[in-house]
């Protein structure tokens, strides 16, 4: 009995030890935190908007860029005489006919906020769905940024696991485009306004610069505008546009008896030119004599070497006649390759043309080149005018101008890679309009920033819709992500009304922060009562693209 008991005890001990050893060496299964999407297909509803179709195309492109997974896109159409096969691995975008899309839509419907979207993962589906096209677009961007951009390159995975489900609500004051570039309004402020809302007169034609070549003063904002014959007000902001104060009033002390009236333009020298150092502030504007018939106008330059506090009148770029044959609307731009400062402007003085676009250049701010044409139409009755020029990363300059003489004074863009060669002067480029025909006319401004899409962002603004619509709303803002080949329209960030004799929206202005991520947009909406006066408002818009 003793031997049998001992043997039994030994066998029990061995069993217990073996069991203990098995417990010590057994490993728990590793929880999957990524999902292989290499075998998935992107599926969209068979009937959907062109905007969502374009957005899905960009979604596919970014998925490939971030994960290395090259997925096909197909619609959810199927032969209704056959049973719908839902066994495939799919990324479902929008309200598809798949069962899991319907289930996700029910969950989303339970939320009261219209700015919501859902992302849900089942065994073989990923659902990305918003309550409308805008929120679906935001859901796709959210998916890319949070789950695709965060994985290893060429992993062909996303940072999601089966069973994941989340509902998000969008709260920011922003616009999102089909390429996922986003415009978010971050500030509205008044630059300057008449003392009374019942005043008679106009505050218009604002321009602005952010100092970049003035050492400790860099980042300061300076602005000017038209506000009568008392001189050009110089407004300053040291808190990036939140508050403003007037620091100077610029008058013409070169042309005896002339008044500073119209079309001021601010510019900061990016390099030394002649006797003037990098960081010198230049104001170019149109002066006129005080004679009763107003028979002389000039393009005159003023300089400040102390960040806009005091000014000196230094030269006339050109001089011509009065209202019917004068010189107007100067625009300055420096070209590194030629080391020239160019002054573009509108010229009424040629009897062969009602108006044409011309320029001169200087290398010392004392002497100027002979006058050269960039747009002079074959039809002498046409009046191209109000130049602004933006340099883009493809090496092209885009020049926007109005074409008075065509109904509504539509806006055109003409391009060149050389400021001294605009091709045939009778060629006035292409009209600025969307594929749907949305466009505008009069008082244009254009500018370009590297922020946004792969080609950066070209923005063009103007005064009124073309043709004049049955509305009192001002012009849209047009955006291009392909160097001005195509445009999309958004509501004007500074809403204003258009009346028969209103000056609202006359010559809006676009400029950017040094890194291009902040758009400073200025315009003159109505201040007070209809037909009374306008004030200058600033809107700051943060621009972010997928790779910003």
List PLM regions with ranges.
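Bacterial N-terminal signal peptides
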Residues: 10-18
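Solvent-exposed alpha-helical segments and adjacent loops
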Residues: 29-178
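Bacterial N-terminal signal peptides that target proteins for export
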Residues: 1-10
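Asp-box/BNR beta-propeller blade signature and adjacent active/binding-site loops
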Residues: 177-548
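Sec-dependent signal peptide cleavage junction
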Residues: 17-33
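Secreted/extracellular small peptides and ectodomain modules produced from precursors
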Residues: 21, 108, 342-343
């Amino acid at each position: 009995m003793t031997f049998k008991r001992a043997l039994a005890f030994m066998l029990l001990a061995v069993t217990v030890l073996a069991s203990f050893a098995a417990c010590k060496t057994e490993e728990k299964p590793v929880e999957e935190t990524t999902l292989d999407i290499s075998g998935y297909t992107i599926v969209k509803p068979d009937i959907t908007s062109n905007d969502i179709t374009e957005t899905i195309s960009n979604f596919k492109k970014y998925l490939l860029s971030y994960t290395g997974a090259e997925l096909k896109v197909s619609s959810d159409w199927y032969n209704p005489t056959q049973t719908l096969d839902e066994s495939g691995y799919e990324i479902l975008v929008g309200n598809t006919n798949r069962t899991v899309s319907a289930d996700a839509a029910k969950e989303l419907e339970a939320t009261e906020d219209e700015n919501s979207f859902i992302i849900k993962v089942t065994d073989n589906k990923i659902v990305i769905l918003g309550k409308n096209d805008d929120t679906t677009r935001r859901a796709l961007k959210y998916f890319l940024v949070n789950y695709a951009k965060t994985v290893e390159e060429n992993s062909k995975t996303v940072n999601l696991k089966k069973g994941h489900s989340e509902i998000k609500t969008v709260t920011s004051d922003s616009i999102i485009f089909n390429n996922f570039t986003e415009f978010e309004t971050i500030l509205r402020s008044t630059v300057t306004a008449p003392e009374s809302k019942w005043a008679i007169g106009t505050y218009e034609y604002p321009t602005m610069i952010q100092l970049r070549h003035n050492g400790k003063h860099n980042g300061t904002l300076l602005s000017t505008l038209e506000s009568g014959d008392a001189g050009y007000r110089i407004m300053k902001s040291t808190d990036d546009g939140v508050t403003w104060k007037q620091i100077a009033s610029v008058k013409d002390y070169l042309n005896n008896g002339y008044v500073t009236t119209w079309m001021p333009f601010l510019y900061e020298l990016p390099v030394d030119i002649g006797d003037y150092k990098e960081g010198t502030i230049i104001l170019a504007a149109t002066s006129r004599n005080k004679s009763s018939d107003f028979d002389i106008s000039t393009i005159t330059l003023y300089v400040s070497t102390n960040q806009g506090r005091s000014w000196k009148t230094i030269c006339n770029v050109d001089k011509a006649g009065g209202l019917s044959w004068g010189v107007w609307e100067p625009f300055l731009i420096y070209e590194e390759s030629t080391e020239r400062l160019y002054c573009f402007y509108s010229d009424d003085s040629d009897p062969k043309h009602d108006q044409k676009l011309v320029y001169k250049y200087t290398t010392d701010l004392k002497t100027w080149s002979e006058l050269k044409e960039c747009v002079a139409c074959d039809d002498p009755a046409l009046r191209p005018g109000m130049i602004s020029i933006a340099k883009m990363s493809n090496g092209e300059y885009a020049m926007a101008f109005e074409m008075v003489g065509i109904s509504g004074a539509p806006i055109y863009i003409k391009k060149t890679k050389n400021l001294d060669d605009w091709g045939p002067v009778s060629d006035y480029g292409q009209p600025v309009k969307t594929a749907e025909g949305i466009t505008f006319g009069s008082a244009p401004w254009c500018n370009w920033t590297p922020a946004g899409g792969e080609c950066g962002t070209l923005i063009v603004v103007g005064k009124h819709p073309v043709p004049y619509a049955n509305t009192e709303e001002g012009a849209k803002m047009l955006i291009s992500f392909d160097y001005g080949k195509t445009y999309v329209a958004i509501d004007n960030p500074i809403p204003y009304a258009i009346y028969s004799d209103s000056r609202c929206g006359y010559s809006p202005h676009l400029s950017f922060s040094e890194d291009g991520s902040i758009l400073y947009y200025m315009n003159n909406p109505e201040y007070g009562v209809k037909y009374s006066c306008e004030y200058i408002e600033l809107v700051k818009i943060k621009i972010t693209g997928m790779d910003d």
